[in-house]
Amino acid sequence: MADKKSSPKKENPQDKTYAIVEASGKQFWLQPNRYYDFDRCQAEVDDVLTLENVLLLNDGKDLKLGKPYVKDAKVEIKVLEHRRGPKIIVYKMRPKKKTRRKNGHRQELTRVLVQSISIGSNTKKSKAVKTTASKVESD
C-alpha cells in the first residue's frame, strides 16, 4: 500500500483576516471575498459601502479589540443584489375551538460582498451608511 504524503497547506495571512462589525442591529463575523446577507439597506446594486463600526479586527498578525470600536478600521462592502429570504410560516391554533390563523413572512435582505478589511488613517473618510431595514406599513 502506498503512503500518501499530505503536503502542508501554505497559509496566507489573507485567509486569517476577519473582522466583527455591527450592522443592521446585529454583529457579523466578516472575511474578505465572501458574501453575506444583511437586512435590506437603502443602497443601489454595485454601490460600495464603508462600515466603520468595527468591534474586533484580526489581520493575521495581531488582534485589535475596540472600546467599543476599533479606531480607523474600515470594512468595504459591495452590494450584489436585493433579495428575499426563505418563507417562514407561523401557524396558530387553539384546540377544541374553531380558531386557526396562518401567516407567512419573507424577510427583505441585501446580499453584500466584503471587498477589503483595512485599518489605518491612509483610507479616505466616507459617510457612514445606515444599514437598517425600513418598516413597511400596510393600510
Swiss-Prot record:
This is Large ribosomal subunit protein bL21. It comes from Prochlorococcus marinus (strain NATL1A). GO terms for cellular component: cytoplasm; ribonucleoprotein complex; ribosome. Part of the 50S ribosomal subunit. Contacts protein L20. GO terms for molecular function: rRNA binding; structural constituent of ribosome. Keywords: Ribonucleoprotein, Ribosomal protein, RNA-binding, rRNA-binding. Belongs to the bacterial ribosomal protein bL21 family. The keyword RNA-binding applies. InterPro entries: bL21-like, bL21-like_sf, Ribosomal_bL21, Ribosomal_bL21_CS. This protein binds to 23S rRNA in the presence of protein L20. PANTHER family: 50S RIBOSOMAL PROTEIN L21, LARGE RIBOSOMAL SUBUNIT PROTEIN BL21M. NCBIfam families: L21. GO terms for biological process: translation. Transmembrane segments: none annotated. Pfam families: Ribosomal_L21p. The keyword Signal does not apply.
